[in-house]
């Protein structure tokens, strides 16, 4: 009887160790990093003929990065901005920007950057293609970015991308013309992520 009891204990111990091993292995397979909303910034600039460029930023941003250490091609990152949180140097035109003529923020409250997947090795992300979604329209855009590992649990991602406002119907009617308010938009990001 002691032998059977000992076999049961060993069997349960082996089962317990396998479960712990599987759990620990899975927890290291995925790393999740969340955006630090207090210090991260997403800003933009649109050239204007014969006057000061339109410059602004989004105060309400969110997002995360998921690193899959087992299959590095399954890494993903998603970031969003609340269109209503836009702040610009031409403050008197803010309502116009939020209106259906430009962003139609009541119907399309978010702008989204989604990588789907990317390869990350040795703090390097080479040129990558993201999907930018504005006003329910998605376009693939190549970007370059730099990753700075500040501490073991804090990373900074910096870079810029360019898109055409005409691709997303940002500016319709008289505002569709790109003679005065140019078509090319520069989007800059300085994002800080902390490990969860």
Positions of predicted regions on the chain:
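Bacterial N-terminal signal peptides that target proteins for export
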Residues: 3-14
């Amino acid at each position: 009887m002691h032998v059977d009891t000992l076999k049961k204990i060993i069997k349960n111990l082996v089962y317990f160790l396998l479960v712990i091993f599987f759990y620990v292995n899975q927890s290291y397979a995925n790393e999740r990093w969340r955006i630090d909303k207090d210090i991260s910034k997403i800003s933009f600039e649109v050239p204007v003929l014969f006057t000061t460029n339109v410059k602004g930023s989004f105060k309400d941003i969110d997002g995360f990065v998921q690193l899959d250490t087992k299959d590095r091609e399954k890494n993903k990152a998603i970031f969003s901005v609340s269109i209503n949180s836009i702040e610009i140097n031409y403050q008197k035109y803010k309502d116009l920007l939020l209106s259906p003529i430009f962003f139609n923020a009541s119907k399309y409250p978010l702008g989204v950057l989604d990588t789907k997947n990317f390869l990350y090795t040795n703090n390097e992300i080479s040129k990558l293609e993201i999907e930018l979604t504005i006003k329910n329209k998605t376009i693939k855009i190549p970007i370059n970015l730099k990753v700075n590992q500040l501490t073991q649990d804090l990373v900074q991602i910096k870079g810029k991308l360019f898109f055409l406002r005409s691709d997303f119907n940002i500016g319709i009617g008289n505002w569709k013309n790109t003679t005065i308010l140019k078509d090319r938009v520069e989007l800059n990001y300085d994002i800080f992520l902390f490990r969860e």
